[in-house]
């Protein structure tokens, strides 16, 4: 085999490699993409339809993600109450509930696109508070209904209860994506990451905190998450290490139940008549406002309440005192301060303090709703002293006076809508006192920290963890595909190298064989010549001897 033949084989291999390379790194098809995400929260569920235009020159269209809008320009979002977790004892009602959520998505996504449109139904802390048996029963009914009714791209793994860490991570991604913090900036030695912002989210059943850290030393692995936006498998340009913690039972509604239970226990301890208690004074309610709740005689432990069979109807009567309210709230934060060397947060959890001098935190859900009620949202800058004065002023206002003020400020609301509106405002003294206590004492934010930004949207896009979930899942898919491509290319390269080595070995083998044959032939030729010469000499000698014999007498 000649070197010309080897060159021909190498050219063929090169062509094959190029064709494989082109196929492997083929750009995503151009077109409109859709994805449906249902946020099944503790107090209600919300369905979002996101869309993006995949670009021919891009492996990912994440930069174009937005909420799908109808012909009138309204977002395709559907809300349903109560929360999915409330259906544990009424499973037969789940199909109607799910259909009400998905009807808008089905009518706004083109029929031809529905089989390629992923559908995710993800429940949060409300579901996490249920037993695993109840969760399984709910999800079984949800999955069965979706698979038998809709054409969306749906797997059983698409309907599940997300962890608190996932909820915090998704919220952090949403905030920084909408702020453009994932865009690389030019640097002296190439592109560099931007500083990111932190995220705080207080829902109905849990509270999340998430922020980027430079070092994870002394942090348990359960508090550390990583997020990558890299396209190159081996690049570390856009990898983020995060501190993420979710406090189950410390959402606003769950903490209120915990707080009422605590007052009930304290009343029993102080009055030795716990089981006869029908009225308990509550400094976290406005004076003149009452709340009636069903309470069981059981201690409050950790994040959850112990199971109990007995229930008592208790009326909590408001006395409106911020200082006493905070005094009652703080023991429930369980601040033991026993961890070392890092400070301890709620429930004695290790927390690495962020850079309070530079890092902004965006406050979602109750961080916005509560501070908005106090009229302490942007453009008003967060200030602890100002917020405290506002809380004290609000807590000391009699209920009827507060109610009258709200009526004057909302004359455009019908009676029905006003009553619904009041439902979100009536616990303002409790909500504000708890939120500020959790923020400054529970999570260690200094009282001079002024970089909290409570908000519902960024750049006119609603801020929801569901957007972060979409980006995370799309990016994870992209990274998986890129890894597969890298593996394929690596395999092709190894294959080609092996083939080349085999060809070289074959050529070397035949070259050696040919040289050996040539050498042998040369040797054989020399021997033949010598033999011929020898025979000629012998013949000549014989002829000479014969001539001598003839001359002898």
Feature-to-residue mapping (PLM):
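Helical "lid/coupling" subdomains associated with nucleotide-phosphate turnover
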Residues: 35, 49, 76-112, 120, ...
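A short acidic Gly-Thr/Ser loop motif
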Residues: 38-46, 199-206
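Beta-propeller domains
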Residues: 54-71
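Short, well-ordered loop/turn elements at secondary-structure boundaries
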Residues: 3-6, 30-32, 42, 115, ...
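N-terminal signal peptide
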Residues: 2, 13-35
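Intrinsically disordered, low-complexity cytosolic terminal tails
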Residues: 531-553
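Primarily extracytoplasmic ectodomains and periplasmic/lumenal surface modules that are beta-strand-rich
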Residues: 43-45, 53-56, 128
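Hydrophobic alpha-helical cores of multi-pass transmembrane domains in eukaryotic membrane proteins
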Residues: 9-16, 498-501
């Amino acid at each position: 085999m000649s070197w010309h033949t080897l060159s021909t084989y190498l050219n063929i291999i090169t062509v094959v490699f190029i064709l494989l390379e082109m196929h492997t790194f083929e750009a995503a098809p151009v077109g409109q993409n859709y994805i449906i995400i249902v946020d099944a929260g503790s107090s209600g569920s919300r369905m979002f339809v996101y869309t993006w235009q995949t670009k021919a020159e891009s492996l990912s269209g994440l930069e174009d993600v937005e909420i799908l809008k109808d012909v009138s320009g309204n977002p395709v979002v559907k809300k349903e109450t109560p929360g999915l977790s409330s259906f544990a004892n009424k499973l037969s009602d789940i199909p109607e509930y799910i259909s009400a959520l998905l009807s808008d998505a089905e009518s706004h996504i083109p029929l031809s696109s529905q089989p390629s449109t992923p559908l995710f139904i993800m429940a949060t802390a409300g579901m996490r508070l249920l037993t695993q048996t109840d969760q399984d029963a709910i999800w079984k009914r949800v999955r069965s209904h979706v698979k038998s009714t809709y054409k969306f791209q749906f797997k059983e793994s698409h309907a599940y209860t997300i962890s608190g860490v996932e909820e915090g991570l998704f919220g952090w991604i949403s905030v920084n994506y909408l702020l453009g913090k994932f865009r690389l900036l030019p640097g002296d030695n190439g592109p560099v990451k931007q500083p990111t912002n932190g995220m705080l989210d207080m829902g109905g059943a849990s509270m999340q905190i998430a922020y980027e850290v430079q070092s994870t030393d002394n942090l348990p692995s359960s508090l550390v998450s990583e997020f990558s936006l890299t396209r190159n498998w081996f690049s570390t340009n856009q990898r983020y290490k995060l501190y993420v913690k979710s406090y189950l039972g410390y959402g606003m509604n769950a903490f209120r139940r915990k707080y009422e239970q605590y007052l009930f226990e304290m009343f029993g301890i102080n009055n030795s008549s716990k089981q006869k208690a029908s009225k308990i004074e509550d400094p976290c309610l406005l004076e003149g406002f009452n709340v009636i709740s069903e309470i069981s005689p059981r201690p409050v432990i950790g994040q959850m309440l112990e199971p109990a069979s007995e229930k008592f109807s208790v009326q909590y009567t408001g006395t409106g005192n911020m200082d006493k309210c905070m005094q009652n709230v703080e023991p429930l934060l369980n601040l033991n301060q026993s961890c070392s060397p890092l400070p301890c947060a709620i429930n004695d959890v290790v927390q690495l303090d962020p850079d309070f001098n530079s890092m902004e935190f965006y406050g979602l859900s109750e961080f916005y709703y509560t501070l908005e009620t106090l009229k302490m949202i942007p453009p008003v800058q967060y200030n602890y002293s100002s917020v405290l004065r506002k809380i004290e002023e609000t807590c000391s206002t009699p209920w009827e006076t507060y109610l009258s003020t709200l009526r004057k400020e909302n004359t455009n609301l019908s009676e029905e809508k006003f009553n619904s509106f009041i439902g979100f405002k009536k616990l303002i003294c409790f909500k504000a006192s708890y939120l500020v206590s959790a923020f400054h004492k529970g999570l260690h934010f200094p009282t001079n920290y002024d970089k909290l930004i409570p908000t519902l949207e960024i750049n006119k896009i609603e801020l929801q963890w569901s957007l972060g979930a979409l980006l995370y899942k799309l990016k994870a898919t992209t990274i998986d595909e890129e890894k597969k491509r890298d593996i394929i290319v690596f395999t092709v390269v190894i294959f080609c190298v092996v083939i080349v080595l085999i060809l070289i070995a074959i050529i070397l083998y035949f070259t050696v064989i040919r040289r050996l044959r040539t050498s042998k032939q040369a040797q054989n030729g020399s021997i033949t010549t010598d033999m011929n010469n020898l025979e000629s000499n012998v013949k000549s000698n014989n002829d000479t001897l014969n001539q001598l014999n003839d001359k002898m007498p």
